């Protein structure tokens, strides 16, 4: 019966390494990859392969990210690592590589640094739900008390940003020494090298402490409307990609955003010119709606399970503003700035009223390349929820990206 073990689908989790530059994020990624490759299910990725992260585009922004996959006995992981600090900021805000949890890397020799703080704040704002901490470069710390001090400081910092600082697992080790040991002996086993064992301990903490995320199909139904047309004798069809959940013929849904919310029943589902009984997250589908005129529904509205999403006009968001080189603005902007907010499938005009710096003070203006917290008000109410991503556009070009951190109204 031993065979079946390899056929089971392990739960999939997306994680990443975050933390201050030069504290060893990429080395740790390589060390995890190499260590877990000794278990035989995934090939090791070398440091250079991870460091030469390819460019990708998300919401009109170019980001360098490396994707590494590996498996523990319990799970399959997709791990994202970014070479530069700006790439992290952009990745976390655009959600280009979604993270269900993250490993915060802190150098045991240096302790938490400014970017450590910034990444914890960002993780909180953009909704990375769970963190595990790796205290790297333990081999450079002779004094046990110093290690305890760094851990204490790390826990306080996490609590400050509303993470459960007392409960988060901290694992100390050396990514470099573990990587060297595995590179020398690729069939190394648990118990043969203390540094490699610490990587196994870290992954045990990740396995147990970072929860398996709810799959998209298990969430409540939502689809943003991309197009609307009428079929003579049958009614109005809204097309789009199902963002989450499952939809069946006969289900009652709400049409939310831009106008009064209204309820309707689904009388048919079509995909690739064929009728279906149900649609799942990820499907591009046409939904036939009972008693709805073509003029009643438009691109930018969403179809959703009743009571699960509501229209709003005011929210706080964490945003990244593109530099001139990235194709963004050449000049700063000030409170009162009125761009378009591209949300799901449509642009809505809004006013940016206020900017707040990380230390809580008001900022007078925002420069290209800045990351800032802002308050915005849209001219039309649309379906908005916490953690939702959007682009900021001006005359059709992207000048920034954001994520809703709080709904105000």
From Swiss-Prot:
Residues 81-84 are annotated as: G3. The keyword Hydrolase applies. Residues 60-64 are annotated as: G2. Its EC number is 3.6.5.3. Residues 136-139 are annotated as: G4. SUPFAM superfamilies: EF-Tu/eEF-1alpha/eIF2-gamma C-terminal domain, P-loop containing nucleoside triphosphate hydrolases, Translation proteins. Keywords: Chloroplast, Elongation factor, GTP-binding, Hydrolase, Magnesium, Metal-binding, Nucleotide-binding, Plastid, Protein biosynthesis. Residues 19-26 are annotated as: G1. GO terms for molecular function: GTP binding; GTPase activity; translation elongation factor activity. One of its GO terms (cellular component) is chloroplast. It is found in: Plastid, Chloroplast. Mg(2+) binds at residue 26. Disulfide bonds: none annotated. Residues 174-176 are annotated as: G5. It catalyses: GTP + H2O = GDP + phosphate + H(+). Residues 10-214 form the tr-type G domain. GTP binds at residues 19-26, 81-85, 136-139. It is an enzyme of class 3 (hydrolase). Belongs to the TRAFAC class translation factor GTPase superfamily. Classic translation factor GTPase family. EF-Tu/EF-1A subfamily. PANTHER family: ELONGATION FACTOR TU, MITOCHONDRIAL (PTHR43721:SF22), ELONGATION FACTOR TU-RELATED (PTHR43721). GTP hydrolase that promotes the GTP-dependent binding of aminoacyl-tRNA to the A-site of ribosomes during protein biosynthesis. This is Elongation factor Tu, chloroplastic. It comes from Porphyra purpurea (Red seaweed). The lineage of its organism: Eukaryota, Rhodophyta, Bangiophyceae, Bangiales, Bangiaceae.
